Amino acid sequence: MIRIKPSTAKFNERAFNNFQKELGASLPIEYKKFLEKNNGGTPEGNIVELKNEEIKSFSVTDFFGINNMKINDLRSQYETYRERIPSRNIPICRAEGGNIVCLNIDNGLISLWDHDTELMDEDFLPANSCFKVASSLEEFLSFIKPYDHEDALDEYKVEDVWIDPDFLKELKSDKD
């Protein structure tokens, strides 16, 4: 499993129980244990690869915890996203690029919420904006692999480049 630097805020059992009451559901025990250990936190450089045509991979930047600073506080993030993500889901961590990883409070399913989908369609339905990532938190955590972005660039080389002819003309005219 990937290393996660725990939050400096300590897990608060009472605040966690109050949050569950607000949700009207008990969160999975494995999620509570994760919060007791890390209470959110920041993972090392990582990648989660998906078997999806639209989104191939993502990186987790921050996990949310109980009574953390507002930007990484579970309750605060839930209030921010509750109308945007599918119902019966809570945001558990932030992914690179503004997307959110969600935990379904009924079945423990982990999904990636793609914020771009709500910008593309006026008839947007939050239920259509998620991609399944894992069947449980434990499975999700096992999918997070260490990844060094700098080393990864060494593996790629440019094979072909296309420049819009109109853009090229504009660049040349700016030089003159």
Which role fits each region the language model picked out?
Residues 141, 147-149, 159:
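Gly/serine-rich nucleotide phosphate-binding loop at the start of the catalytic core
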Residues 104-107:
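Short acidic-glycine loop/turn motifs at beta-strand connectors
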Residues 113-145:
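Compact, glycine/acidic-enriched structural inserts
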Residues 56, 98-101, 117-124:
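Short, surface-exposed beta-strand/loop "edge" segments at domain boundaries and coil↔beta transitions
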Residues 1-100, 151-160, 165-176:
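A surface-exposed partner-binding patch
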Residues 93, 111-113:
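Residues in well-ordered beta-strands of folded domains
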